[in-house]
């Protein structure tokens, strides 16, 4: 029963500690885009790249 206050205080200290990144940021770090944007961008790139040669891929973007 004596350990409970110590345990609670430790939890509060851990929760209020500032977060530290595991890996330092470099100048090359780029924020990630949402996966929906990545898929849309990939389809647009695919359309631009293959449509002049392969017409079946022109309808992949749904438009």
From Swiss-Prot:
Propeptide segments, given as residue ranges: 23-49, 61-63
Molecular function terms from GO: ion channel regulator activity; toxin activity
Organism: Conus amadis (Amadis cone)
Major subcellular location class: secreted
Domains (record comment): The cysteine framework is V (CC-CC).
Record's comment on post-translational modification: Is not hydroxylated.
Tissue note: Expressed by the venom duct.
Protein name: Conotoxin Am5.1
Gene Ontology cellular-component terms listed: extracellular region
Positions of disulphide bridges: none
């Amino acid at each position: 029963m004596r350990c409970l206050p110590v345990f609670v205080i430790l939890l509060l200290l851990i929760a209020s500690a500032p977060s530290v990144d595991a890996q330092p940021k470099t100048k090359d770090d780029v924020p990630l885009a949402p996966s929906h944007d990545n898929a849309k961008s990939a389809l647009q790139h695919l359309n631009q790249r293959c449509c002049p040669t392969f017409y079946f891929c022109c309808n992949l973007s749904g438009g």
